[in-house]
Amino acid sequence: MSPQTETKASVGFKAGVKEYKLTYYTPEYETKDTDILAAFRVTPQPGVPPEEAGAAVAAESSTGTWTTVWTDGLTSLDRYKGRCYHIEPVPGEETQFIAYVAYPLDLFEEGSVTNMFTSIVGNVFGFKALAALRLEDLRIPPAYTKTFQGPPHGIQVERDKLNKYGRPLLGCTIKPKLGLSAKNYGRAVYECLRGGLDFTKDDENVNSQPFMRWRDRFLFCAEAIYKSQAETGEIKGHYLNATAGTCEEMIKRAVFARELGVPIVMHDYLTGGFTANTSLAHYCRDNGLLLHIHRAMHAVIDRQKNHGMHFRVLAKALRLSGGDHVHAGTVVGKLEGDRESTLGFVDLLRDDYVEKDRSRGIFFTQDWVSLPGVLPVASGGIHVWHMPALTEIFGDDSVLQFGGGTLGHPWGNAPGAVANRVALEACVQARNEGRDLAVEGNEIIREACKWSPELAAACEVWKEIRFNFPTVDKLDGQE
């Protein structure tokens, strides 16, 4: 055999299956600043050692396959393979452990969340040797972060565009979410905006259905925006949902929104997909549109504690892909959300640098290297009695969104909006005066009721409403 045709097999290639840990478990490895780091919650099948399971995750999410192949000899596995570099037990869980995996940056296409997730949370989640697998956190290195545009505008630019400072923004999702005609929908938008809200919102499943085509909705909502702006002297917006069946149609809807001169559009980033979302985010930056992101489908992925992907990972992915707002739970409303865990990923959305803090579920220090921040949106089962807690939990850089908590007011949409605005202004003023919202919240709301009949009526309607259910996805060590 000539040297030109010599194969790996002829110089010692050995076919067959070998244990993953022989190649992919490397506890001596020192991580690099350019590595993408992942923390997986691994539940191996009975009889599978933790080291083998962790190595299997590293292999199947990077360069490995189920058997040895001769083409391994045509590249440098040592350069490209993922490495399980540390394993630790999970408190209170005998069958689970956390496996830390480092991925070389060269494994990923620049500026592509789609490609990053295809590797890290791809086929490995169906691997038979694992009973369950969950991605708890990712460390995105600055070298990779810098390949993304990120949010179209970010928190400070949004405040400058809207001329709104020193308080959370107020929103409302129009209800019923499906079934209204475009004209009646626009009327509901107008009533909410003139009552004092900053934004109204399409529900996530409002796209372009037979009862209300998208173009008609956009036109009537634009009319509502301009009319309410003229009456109040404040800049208003409505999240026009541009989500569509194709990227081309999505961009067409965003173009029409820009032509109408409205300030913001919306996208369902998980059902629409990261490729579509990044495309829309780029269009929004180039054309001066803010981008509101809904997380429909997230609970399919993130709610179960032992399998899937934690929302903090989806939040980081959204900041890379692009969005100026994203729904982030409420802690106090009808939807799932542990307080410390929620505050952890809220910081990951807003702040430029976030230290590792396992008490809040943050496994890695994250440096965003000046990537614009994202406003967290608190939405789902909240009303005026929640306003002190929401203001205290989320702070000024947030959007507090009341759907039923606005439209369910006994006097109508505009009085419902007035009630929310009065409650918010009262809470912000009390906080600025040094009062403790966590302790005095109810008293602050009762005081405001004395000079706002709209707020008093809202407080009477919702005084007994509670959503007292335990959180499913708790941090480790919590009972």
Swiss-Prot record:
It catalyses: 2 (2R)-3-phosphoglycerate + 2 H(+) = D-ribulose 1,5-bisphosphate + CO2 + H2O; D-ribulose 1,5-bisphosphate + O2 = 2-phosphoglycolate + (2R)-3-phosphoglycerate + 2 H(+). The keyword Chloroplast applies. Mg(2+) binds at residues 201, 203-204. Transmembrane segments: none annotated. Pfam families: RuBisCO_large, RuBisCO_large_N. The modification Phosphoserine is found at residue 208. Its EC number is 4.1.1.39. The modification N6-carboxylysine is found at residue 201. Residues 1-2 form a propeptide. Belongs to the RuBisCO large chain family. Type I subfamily. This is Ribulose bisphosphate carboxylase large chain. It comes from Arabis hirsuta.
